[in-house]
Amino acid sequence: MRGIIYCDKLETGLAEFKKIIEDYANIGITCDKPVANANQARVTFNNGDEWIVVRATEGSARGHACNVAYIDRMIPDDFVETIIMPTIKAFPYQAYRYYNWGTW
């Protein structure tokens, strides 16, 4: 399973990333050391799942594919519809959720 956390600002994406790592740890699934740079972060878990954090920019967000997407609510709706939604390969399910609701 591959998951992507799309974020408007890397800090908000990394906060959600840490929550996911904690959730996996709580059910006994460990991970390799997360790797991060200026535009994205990545972690692979011992069950084979992979999660990455990607900034929602034209250059960074294109070309990815995932089974599950977590989408920062601060990302404009037109960007979500045209760039992010086509990357989700979990049909017929809608395998996405929004996060970062509290900053509106």
Positions of PLM-derived features:
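Short, flexible loop motifs at catalytic/binding sites
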Residues: 1-104
